[in-house]
Every structure is written in structure tokens, then in C-alpha cells.
């Protein structure tokens, strides 16, 4: 995590001084190759937290993301008034401060006897995925996680286009909608994950949360009022309880020295979803907004995402049923 944080600071420095597209792309490549801060933070949480408390703490990581989702663009816009480079220098300073804090304050999460020696073959995400997928308890959750990630990336992919095309939103209204989502997501992750787990348990939190996501996606697909969509946004963010609960379920299926490997695989699956989802969702969006032979339906990608989430729910419920049917 410290190495990734240090390289993150270097990346922001390169972005600040980049004077051509090639240096900019180099900085982005470096970031992609070393972007392990989030997955290692989750692995660290898994290492130091008893199994029953992991989902709630994973939710707190999600809450931090929600806060950053709101504050990052706002602070970046203010700094950009000083210069285009100022936001990158500020991000470099934050990453550097994070590195210093981690180096001097954060202890190692596992004792030496429980750490696994580095294996280059397991560092390959495909090899790691293959190894984890061979574990019966992880096959179905990993597939559910991937399908869910592809579906939920619809928000990042077409949200701005959807608001502008369907409701004539200005850039300010799009920004407002994103701020509402970020605040709602942070509140949901910080305050709702733990009560949901306590009342429902991890298993029901996952599939009920996914059903909640399906309802939200269908509504976004068919609503014709921009105001109604803005009102719906806080409720769409509540479906965020699914991911920490599902991560906690999967973390119980691996040994203590494989938590980092699991989180790395989940990060790789997220990356795959971030490649596939834009390709599919933008094609569907264009098909239903620019093709005169099709009905005008800007929300079509959300309906596709709802269909994918339905598949994920069916797979997850089938897994739960098969596990409950096993003899004790």
C-alpha cells in the first residue's frame, strides 16, 4: 500500500508538469499498473477485523469514497481557478502526506509467520483469479460480483449524457445530481451498513440490496421527470450496502494470508467491468437516442443494467439455496 501511495504522488506530479499527451498517458499507465491502494486498504481491514465486523468496516471505506466523490471535484474546481496544475499538486501533497502517515503510524497488519512469500505467478491477476475460482465457496460470488460491477458501472458511463439528453440538464444540474449521490452514498455506507447487517444478516443484505438496485434501475429507465430522478437519487445510493456485505462473505472463504489476493482479484474484476460496461452501455444509449428506427428511450441502459442485476440475484439466491441444503 505504501509503494502504491508513493507512486500515486509521483503520478500526480507527472500530471502537473505534463506538457504533452505522451507524458500524460505515461502517468496514467503508471497509475493503472500500481493502483493497489484501495484493494490493499480493504485487505488491511480484513486482516485486522474479526469476520463478523468486516462488512461494516468495508462500508466505512465506501463512505470515505462517497465523501471524496463530493469534496474532490469541489476542491479541484476551486484550485483550478488558481491554475490548471494546482489540483494535481494538491493531490500530490495529499498522497505524500498519506504515505508519511502510513510509514510512521500504520503497523503491519499480519505477523511475519502469517505472511505468504511473494509469488510472481500469483501476482498475475488471471492466475490469482483462477486459483480463487477453484474454491467452491468463491466461484458464484465472484461471478455475481462481476455481473453486478458491469451493471452498476452504468452510472459512471452514461449519467451525464442521460441527464442532458432526457431532461435537458445543465452541467450545474449534473454536478448537483452527482453531489446528491455522493452524500447519500457516504451516509448509506457509514450509517446503514451495520444496522442492515445486524437486522438482516450478510446474506439477506446482499440479495435484498440487489433487488433494491433493480427497482431503482427500472425507475431510472422509465421516468420522464428530471425532478423525480433527483428525488430518486438518494434511494439509488442505498443499494451500496450490497458490496461490503458481499466482500465480507467472500473474505471468509479465504485464508488470512490471501486477503490481499482476494481484494486484488476483485479490483481486477472491477477493471474488467469498467472496460466492458462503457462499450455496451454507450452503444445501447446511442441506439435508443439517435436511431430514428428505435423508440426514444435514454433510460434503456438502466433497463439493461436491471436485467443484469436480475441475473446476479438469481445466481446468488441459487448459491444460498444450495449452501443451505448441504448437510451440517
Segments from the language model and where they lie:
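Helix-breaking motifs and short loop linkers at transmembrane-helix boundaries and internal kinks
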Residues: 17-22, 34, 168, 222-224
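Cytoplasmic helix-loop-helix junction between adjacent transmembrane helices
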Residues: 27-66
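A membrane-interface helix-boundary motif in multi-pass transporters
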Residues: 80-93, 283-307
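Helix-to-loop junctions at the C-terminal end of transmembrane segments
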Residues: 188-202
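Structural signature of the two symmetry-related core transmembrane helices
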Residues: 1-14, 204-219
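Multi-pass alpha-helical transporter architecture, strongest
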Residues: 99-105, 303-328
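Short amphipathic helix-loop junctions that connect adjacent transmembrane helices
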Residues: 157-174
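Juxtamembrane intracellular "pre-TM" segments in multi-pass secondary transporters
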Residues: 107-144, 166
Amino acid at each position: 500500500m505504501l509503494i502504491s501511495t508513493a507512486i500515486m504522488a509521483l503520478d500526480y506530479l507527472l500530471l502537473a508538469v505534463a506538457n504533452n499527451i505522451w507524458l500524460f498517458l505515461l502517468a496514467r499507465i503508471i497509475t493503472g499498473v500500481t493502483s493497489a491502494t484501495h484493494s490493499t486498504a480493504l485487505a488491511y481491514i480484513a486482516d485486522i477485523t474479526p469476520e463478523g465486523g468486516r462488512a461494516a468496516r468495508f462500508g466505512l471505506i465506501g463512505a470515505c469514497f462517497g465523501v471524496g466523490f463530493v469534496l474532490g471535484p469541489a476542491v479541484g474546481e476551486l484550485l483550478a481557478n488558481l491554475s490548471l496544475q494546482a489540483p494535481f499538486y494538491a493531490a500530490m501533497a495529499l498522497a505524500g502526506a498519506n504515505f508519511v502517515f502510513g510509514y510512521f503510524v500504520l503497523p503491519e497488519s499480519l505477523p511475519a509467520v502469517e505472511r505468504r512469500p511473494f509469488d510472481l505467478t500469483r501476482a498475475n491477476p488471471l492466475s490469482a483469479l483462477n486459483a480463487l475460482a477453484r474454491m467452491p465457496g468463491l466461484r458464484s460470488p465472484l461471478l455475481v460480483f462481476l455481473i453486478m460491477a458491469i451493471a452498476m458501472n452504468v452510472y459512471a458511463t452514461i449519467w451525464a449524457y442521460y441527464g442532458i439528453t432526457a431532461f435537458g440538464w445543465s452541467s450545474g444540474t449534473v454536478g448537483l445530481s452527482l453531489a446528491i449521490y455522493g452524500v447519500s452514498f457516504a451516509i448509506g455506507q457509514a450509517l446503514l451498513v451495520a444496522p442492515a447487517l445486524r437486522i438482516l444478516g450478510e446474506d439477506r443484505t446482499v440479495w435484498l440490496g440487489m433487488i433494491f438496485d433493480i427497482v431503482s434501475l427500472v425507475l431510472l429507465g422509465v421516468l420522464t421527470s428530471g425532478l423525480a430522478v433527483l428525488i430518486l437519487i438518494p434511494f439509488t445510493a442505498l443499494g451500496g450496502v450490497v458490496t461490503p456485505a458481499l466482500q465480507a462473505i467472500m473474505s471468509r472463504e479465504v485464508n488470512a494470508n490471501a486477503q490481499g489476493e482476494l481484494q486484488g482479484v476483485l479490483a481486477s474484476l472491477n477493471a474488467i467491468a469498467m472496460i466492458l460496461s462503457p462499450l455496451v452501455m454507450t452503444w445501447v444509449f446511442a441506439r435508443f437516442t439517435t436511431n430514428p428506427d428505435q423508440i426514444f428511450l435514454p433510460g434503456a441502459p438502466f433497463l439493461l443494467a436491471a436485467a443484469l442485476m436480475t441475473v446476479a440475484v438469481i445466481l446468488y439466491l441459487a448459491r444460498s439455496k444450495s449452501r443451505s441444503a448441504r448437510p451440517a
